[in-house]
């Protein structure tokens, strides 16, 4: 590919990310798997300043589940990950949490920043980042094939606590053909800041998952004959901590409805 | 190697780390390059609680220079990285900083924890971790050959600031034969949480290094004909931030005199 062609591909990807964010700002709601391919997507959690230290420490102690890509300081809503973006409006769907309970889903979080002007926002790596490399290697990603949301599960594994925060690990699942599991592990493993290699392959019961066809978040997907469920640490883990710890107030993205950045996936490749 | 042999090798490595820490606790002072081969070593900085958020954010924003391996909460001095270790005594040499100036080097930091009972301690990845894999690949590590401290340099590259903290990037340097630079980059790149791949190869002037034979920290090393200086982000970067930002009080390790943990280097391999 010539430099000129490469520039055009990059510009098109950034433009796709921008267009997606603008459509969400205008009110469109959709899961973001497969949106703006090649651009990194991020999980979001915003907490009052008083909780920011506990959360950043929780993330540091659980880096596979909570790899922090950016922190937006108290009251601010711009990020270095996407020029001109507004974190209060540019995610397709938000969840509002009060005293550890999900109370509402909204498409525009601006009023919540007015209610809590000191929110500190954390943007956390998302496994969607390594889905493009998986697809490029000829590994099917079922929820993209089917146009659905990735299935996510609460597990019986406790994260390492920090301050007032504790909770269980949440995982995402992709069914992978037995012959491609090693490839999927190696490819995703080269992206440690967006969850990296799988935490578990097969045997959902060992993670405390009673029914693989009934995820706690997102949509169930087909598991074909010859495929094994493969589990990756998931950026919904902070929402589990909000629930388990009874955090007084938090705003998060809705699972699968991510913040689409202007950062190419390749940035996180080691 | 049989399982039994592997267990013995591991036990010997943990024992070597423990013996090293005990000797430092007893007062021995030495640079730790090459000590307890295969066990991860860490940079240390302890700051009053009021500065902890700024520092953790600074580390998150400059992950190549400041990859956080553990945070010890206010007033505590034990770490999950080394059972039974005491962070106040088990580093061979400490530096004491007041108002951004180095005022003292001490072998026992216990009185400083009495003076500031709310110190939060950060343990940060160290490039010594990938030196064993470099040696195993037949790449000479000059400062280990010569039994000296690794040379470190302040650069003209500013880190991304956080709160009250700003400062320049500090780098370590290893001269590498031209034919092995790609290997050294790939091998170290597989250890992203201990500084990862080099930030710069050759051309010290571009980093603002006036004289490669006069490092700002550590010892000068020979650069043989056919070798190129290769630069990695360095965990002394927090000390540069302490100086540049005039931090009122901090305790750090002395450059090259690291905290030797019980964690095998391979833990940080992706």
From Swiss-Prot, chains A, B:
The keyword DNA damage does not apply. SUPFAM superfamilies: PSTPO5379-like (SSF160920). Coiled coil: none annotated. Keywords: Lyase. The keyword Lyase applies. Its EC number is 4.2.1.-. It holds the Pfam family D-Glu_cyclase. One of its GO terms (molecular function) is lyase activity. InterPro entries: D-Glu_cyclase (IPR009906), Putative_hydro-lyase (IPR038021), UPF0317 (IPR016938). Belongs to the D-glutamate cyclase family. HAMAP family: Hydro_lyase (MF_01830). This is Putative hydro-lyase Reut_A2449. It comes from Cupriavidus pinatubonensis (strain JMP 134 / LMG 1197).
């Amino acid at each position: 590919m010539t430099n000129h062609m490469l520039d055009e591909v990059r510009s098109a990807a950034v433009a796709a990310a921008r267009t997606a964010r603008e459509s969400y700002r205008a009110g469109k709601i959709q899961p973001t798997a497969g949106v703006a391919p090649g651009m990194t997507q991020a999980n979001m959690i915003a907490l009052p300043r008083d909780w920011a230290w506990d959360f950043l420490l929780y993330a540091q102690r659980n880096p596979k589940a909570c790899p922090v890509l950016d922190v937006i300081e108290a009251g601010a809503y711009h990020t270095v990950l996407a020029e001109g973006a507004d974190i209060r409006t540019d995610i397709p769907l938000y969840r509002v949490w009060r005293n550890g309970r999900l109370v509402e889903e909204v498409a525009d979080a601006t009023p919540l920043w007015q209610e809590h002007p000191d929110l500190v926002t954390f943007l956390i790596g998302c496994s969607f980042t390594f889905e493009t490399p998986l697809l490029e290697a000829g590994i099917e990603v079922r929820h993209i094939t089917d146009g659905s949301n990735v299935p996510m599960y609460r597990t019986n594994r406790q994260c390492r606590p920090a301050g007032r925060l504790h909770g269980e690990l949440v995982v995402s699942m992709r069914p992978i053909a037995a012959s491609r599991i090693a490839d999927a592990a190696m490819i995703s493993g080269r992206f440690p800041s967006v969850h990296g290699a799988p935490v578990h392959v097969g045997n959902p019961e060992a993670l405390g998952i009673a029914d693989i066809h009934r995820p706690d978040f997102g949509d169930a997907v087909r598991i074909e004959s010859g495929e094994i469920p493969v589990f990756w640490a998931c950026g919904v883990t902070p929402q589990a901590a909000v629930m388990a710890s009874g955090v007084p107030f938090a705003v998060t993205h809705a699972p699968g409805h991510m913040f689409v950045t202007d950062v190419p996936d390749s940035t996180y490749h080691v």
